[in-house]
A protein has these predicted regions:
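Alpha-helical DNA-recognition elements
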Residues: 59
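Glycine-centered, phosphate/nucleic-acid-interacting loop/turn motifs that mediate DNA/RNA or nucleotide
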Residues: 64
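Basic, amphipathic "hinge/linker" alpha-helix immediately C-terminal to the N-terminal HTH DNA-binding motif
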Residues: 74-96
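Short beta-strand "wing" residues that participate in macromolecule-binding interfaces
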Residues: 68
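Amphipathic alpha-helical dimerization/coiled-coil segments
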Residues: 3, 90-114
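N-terminal helix-turn-helix DNA-binding core of bacterial DNA-binding proteins
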Residues: 10-54, 71
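Intrinsically disordered, low-complexity serine/threonine- and proline-rich regulatory segments
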Residues: 1-17, 78, 95, 105
């Protein structure tokens, strides 16, 4: 594969997984936006900027998957915290199941499944 197709493939994979990763980052409980970014930056190959997640979080709010609350901070301006709604948890569960099926299928194709 030359650089063009591989680069395009990597971009498409990251776009597809970003929503799944954002929702999974919110599963333990409410998160400040920047904390989500820091968690996602720890995922090798994801490569995201701070501005990347906020439009997605906004769309999740519109769709009812995420709620946001603004809280005063002693460390500067007020912060917006995000958390999953019951609908968001249901969607995440279904997305994780779909990802697990796809991932297992790819592993089987590669001969890596046990």
């Amino acid at each position: 594969m030359d650089e063009g197709p591989l680069t395009n493939w990597n971009v498409q994979i990251r776009k597809g997984l970003l929503e799944l990763c954002i929702l999974n980052a919110l599963l333990p409980g409410r998160q400040y936006g920047y904390d989500i970014v820091k968690q996602l930056r720890d995922i090798d190959g994801l490569m995201i900027g701070e501005g990347t997640i906020y439009p997605i979080l906004s769309r999740f709010r519109t769709q009812g998957q995420v709620e946001a609350t603004i809280e005063e901070s002693t460390e500067g301006p007020a912060r917006k915290y995000y958390r999953l709604t019951p609908l968001g948890k249901k969607c995440l569960s279904e997305m994780n199941q779909a990802w697990d099926r796809i991932h297992l299928g790819v592993l089987k194709l590669r001969g890596d499944a046990t």
